[in-house]
A protein has these predicted regions:
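Flexible glycine/proline-enriched surface loops and loop-helix/loop-strand junctions
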Residues: 156-160
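C-terminal functional module detector
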Residues: 1-3, 182-188, 192-262
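A metal-dependent hydrolase metal-coordination microenvironment
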Residues: 1-153, 166-182, 191
Length: 262
């Protein structure tokens, strides 16, 4: 088996992210990643404009994030845009499965903060669904938002963003444990939800979830049966096969790399 380190749940200028795909790829290379999966909101523009492939030495793949207000769902390895359906997310799940993709319930539990987007949350609300492949048990931007519990702490976190990162979401872990105990083939995922947005704090420009930081945080490591070859199609298949079969783990690589864990 060959170990490769990647990062999923990333937004670019094709939706509400601050970076172009080529800029994001360059940051991923600097962080020592082997692959990234861009998941812009409600579109596959990057895929259809030929952004997939090796850029700056890193394998760039394009998926998408479906739904806007709630029931966010990551759709990986799909060719056609999956339509939003927040009121019936099972329809979204079924469409990803029809395309033989990988579907992941994203940031299912959020508390929100009145100091960040006026308390908005994007939780998963329908747990009667079935046939999804994964649950995002660790999402950096969700934890960052939830930790903004006061004005002073919010300012502190803006300038010390890693302080908002603690551990995987216990509620999401509990649900994953319950489903796996029932014999369901559902795997753990994690990501930063990187947007690379620039805001102003007084006169100072500050980046929220900068790519160069996020790519050292919640990464996903896979075990591939074959060495990545540099061929886009072959290597995509290797990465997605590993994810589908659960030959992967997630880890915070900020303080110490988890390379070689398995």
């Amino acid at each position: 088996m060959f170990e490769y380190k990647g990062h999923i749940h990333i937004h670019s200028r094709y939706s509400d992210g601050g970076g172009k795909v080529k800029q994001i790829a360059a940051e991923a290379t600097k962080a020592g990643l082997d692959f990234i999966i861009i998941t812009d909101h409600c579109n596959l523009d990057g895929l259809h404009k030929g952004e997939e492939g090796y850029q700056s030495g890193v394998l760039v793949m394009i998926g998408m994030e479906v739904n806007q207000e709630c029931n966010h769902y990551l759709a990986l390895s799909v060719k056609d845009v999956v339509a939003n359906n927040e009121h019936n997310p099972q329809v979204v799940i079924d469409e990803v499965n029809r395309q033989q993709g990988i579907g992941i319930i994203a940031h299912p539990f959020e508390k929100g903060s009145p100091y960040y987007q006026k308390g908005r949350t994007y939780e998963w609300k329908d747990w009667a669904v079935s046939d999804f492949q994964g649950i995002e048990i660790w999402n950096y931007i969700s934890q960052f938002r939830d930790e903004c519990t006061s004005v002073l702490k919010s300012i502190y976190l803006i300038f010390n963003p890693v302080a908002g990162l603690s551990r995987p979401c216990s509620k999401a872990l509990n649900i994953l444990d319950q489903l796996q105990t029932r014999g369901q083939k559902i795997f753990a995922y994690g990501g930063s939800d990187a947007h690379g947005m620039i805001i102003r704090v007084g006169p100072l420009p500050v980046s929220i979830s900068p790519y160069n930081l996020c790519f050292h945080l919640i990464n996903i490591h896979i075990l591939s049966k074959r060495r990545l070859s540099g061929d886009l199609q072959l290597d995509k298949e290797q990465v997605y096969e590993a994810l589908k079969q659960g030959r992967s783990w997630i880890a915070c690589d900020y303080y110490r790399p988890s390379d070689g864990f398995c």
